[in-house]
Amino acid sequence: MADTSHLERMGRELKCPICLSLYNSAVSLSCNHVFCNACIVKSMKMDATCPVCKIPYHRREIRGAPHMDSLVSIYKNMEDASGIKLFVSQNNPSPSDKEKQVRDASVEKASDKNRQGSRKGRASKRNEYGKTKEIDVDAPGPIVMKPSSQTKKRVQLLQNLSAESLTKPTESVETAEKPKDYTENTVIRLDEHPSLNKEGNLSPFFWLRDEDDGENSSQRTESDQLLGTTPVNVPSFSDLMDSDHESPSKEDEQQKPNPGDMFDSEMFEWTQRPCSPEILPSPVKAKVLGRDEIDLTQKKLPKVKVASSKCKNRKAGSARNTVARRSIGVSQEDNMESSAAATISEQQDSRGTSGTIIRNDVNTDENVKAKRATRSKAQSTRVQSDLNVSNEADGKQGTKRKRSSIKSSPAHPIAGPNELSLGTEIVGKGDQDQAHGPSDTHPEKRSPTEKPSLKKRGRKSNASSSLKDLSGKTQKKTSEKKLKLDSHMISSKATQPHGNGILTAGLNQGGDKQDSRNNRKSTVGKDDHTMQVIEKCSTINKSSSGGSAHLRRCNGSLTKKFTCAFCQCSEDTEASGEMTHYYRGEPVSADFNGGSKVIHVHKNCAEWAPNVYFNDLTIVNLDVELTRSRRISCSCCGLKGAALGCYNKSCKNSFHVTCAKLIPECRWDNVKFVMLCPLDASIKLPCEEANSKDRKCKRTPKEPLHSQPKQVSGKANIRELHIKQFHGFSKKLVLSCSGLTVEEKTVIAEFAELSGVTISKNWDSTVTHVIASINENGACKRTLKFMMAILEGKWILTIDWIKACMKNTKYVSEEPYEITMDVHGIREGPYLGRQRALKKKPKLFTGLKFYIMGDFELAYKGYLQDLIVAAGGTILRRRPVSSDDNEASTIVVFSVEPSKKKTLTQRRSDAEALAKSARARAASSSWVLDSIAGCQILVLI
């Protein structure tokens, strides 16, 4: 019993979690869970996650597990030796049957022939039904769209195909047709040895087939069951598509294909290299050839067999589904040519023989020439040449397609370089493979991963079979084809955006006239769409047409819009001016080929840039201004490129010229090319200052006083009288305002206009009087001008002095109006400063050195340093060192402003420690300001 329990435990470990039977062709996932190959294949159709742990996986992550199959084989041998059957495997033949299957190859051949015969019987029935279906292809009724896989085909291996089935021409065609519904152009041949193909390479899972042929019987049975059904449209779970990036060489194309060398293993297209346990992707030489190419190589096949195979295809996929598949094209790459093929197939169906196909194509080509001749002869030659060039531009692929076209119809005449028929163009593009393929799904239901495989199958196709199987059911899908074509043309050919609509409209009009002339109203929509496709193809390929094609200039407007480098706008407005183009400073035309070195700017944007000027026609500093403006955002729209700043230097607003023109409050100087923003509208522009100087010059009397009132207006006369009445004002008198209100500034401006004194906005050593604002207590705020005026010994007066001068119309003494106190309580600072300057005493901080440490705001620290230097002190850039001087002359200044890093106590202690080590004194920033405001050095605490 102990042995039985161990055997039972081993059997549980060797069970598949899906089918609960012993592993059959075991494979493992990236999560190390093991399943049967067939089980995980079926599971992946519904959900690409591990059935045990639900971890997502891709098809490339599935790897064979031969060691598990070896364990299953050992387990079965142990069961046979013990005589106990604990678990039932997926197929459990008797030991005697196993030995017979391994030893006797003749029995296997016989069973293969029997199965082959049964398939032939079923195929003949489908053949008969297909013939009736072909006759009644236009019968009324709903069109049933059966799903079909459009990706790289995943097939069940046909384990039991005999070698004789591929040697006979008739059996080869019919055998390739039977799995057609599921395998899509796959022909498989296995030799007598189950592990070797014709070249002697090991087949996939060869280690499994040597173990037990009895287990493969279940796979054969399952494959037989799947042959009669259409598989579910399964998306591809792998991005390994070797054939999308590689193509067979010319030698491989010219060689006669051997279907015995081509096979797919299950759904993964694995192959096994000799003496290698790794499962690798299929190489290029092992790709499955389309059955149409195989039909080309077997020249002994009669045409009757080809017709019967077409009928069989119509039974499996239905003729209407084939037409639906043709309507949406083989792929996004070849959809234009496939639409043209749909029209040609209609003409072919109305005539019925392949011999008339080329004649119809020639007629179609002549009709196209007649339509285009209504517009111009040059357009006809261009379109036909572009069709030919488009076919030649495909390189090796195009050469191979032309070769396959010639093989399929050797009696067809070859068109000239400018007379390439539509039929030859379509054959070269490889649409003919779709006629024998299964029915396609609806365009909206197609998986995105199906397109690459459609491209592959479209390139490996046959001409005659395509032209014979096409039907005229494309009218219902015309609108959908136009949408898909237009969207693809826009996305993939964005470099050719102009001219397509104009040419297409003309061709549509010509196509309608030609159709009405031939009384073929049923094909109007299809012919129009064919013309659109051909015109789009010629427009796209005109760049590669070389000198063989005649190019025609489009009638539409192709003016390219340029974007201004400053305002980022491409439209020319009255505010921006016209668009100009400069190459290395020189003006050029719009179509000048200078690359990225050509600068496109509006005329006004360039003229109003601050540092840009013109030397004759050459523009100077344009690139420098562009570099500067790329870092400046517009105060109006927020975009970069705002080169135009406010005339007020202290204002930080910058604008695009076009944005500033939209603001009515902005003031402009068209002479100096400067602008004032709405916030500084009260400031005078250079042109206004010049006008005021001119007015002052005109006010100088050149005639007697009695004639003056007759020459000027009453208001000007009053001002002239006021100016004459102000006596005692020196021309060197310069006023500066400090903290005044708007009303007080207005009084100052009026006084300056009447008296002729100068007003300075910023502090300067030439300032003689500082007019400051005071509160109800007579104290003024500490400003930079106030502190500098104390150190320089200037007058610091209230606004009352200005009012007194205007009232008395003469110079009034300043002493009664001098400010004596600031808001911090320091008194007599302005008076002491004036006395120090009058007596020519040394400055306040003469002989003292200051080291500023701690966390100061940059602006505050800069103002503090300016005040110390103006007071005669010295700023140390490095930490002070100890000196032998008896009297300490170095002061370490720390900040008293609130800071997030350190408290006031910590900053004070740090300054005192540094001062002690350097034999210096520590002082706060408020001590420095108080000393300057009082014009005397205060005692350090």
Swiss-Prot record:
Residues 96-115, 125-136, 175-196, 242-255, 428-453, 477-487, 512-528 have a biased composition (Basic and acidic residues). Disruption phenotype: Enhanced sensitivity to mitomycin C. It comes from Arabidopsis thaliana (Mouse-ear cress). This is Protein BREAST CANCER SUSCEPTIBILITY 1 homolog. PANTHER family: BREAST CANCER TYPE 1 SUSCEPTIBILITY PROTEIN (PTHR13763:SF0), BREAST CANCER TYPE 1 SUSCEPTIBILITY PROTEIN BRCA1 (PTHR13763). Residues 724-819, 840-941 form the BRCT domain. A motif (Nuclear localization signal 1) lies at residues 298-305. A motif (Nuclear localization signal 2) lies at residues 444-451. The keyword Cell cycle does not apply. Residues 157-173, 216-236, 329-357, 376-391, 489-498 have a biased composition (Polar residues). One of its GO terms (biological process) is DNA recombination. Keywords: DNA damage, DNA repair, Metal-binding, Nucleus, Repeat, Zinc, Zinc-finger. Plays a role in DNA repair and in cell-cycle control. Required for the repair of DNA double-strand breaks (DSBs), both natural and induced by genotoxic stress, by homologous recombination (HR). InterPro entries: BRCA1-associated, BRCT_dom, BRCT_dom_sf, EPHD, Znf_RING, Znf_RING/FYVE/PHD, Znf_RING_CS. A zinc finger (RING-type) spans 16-54.
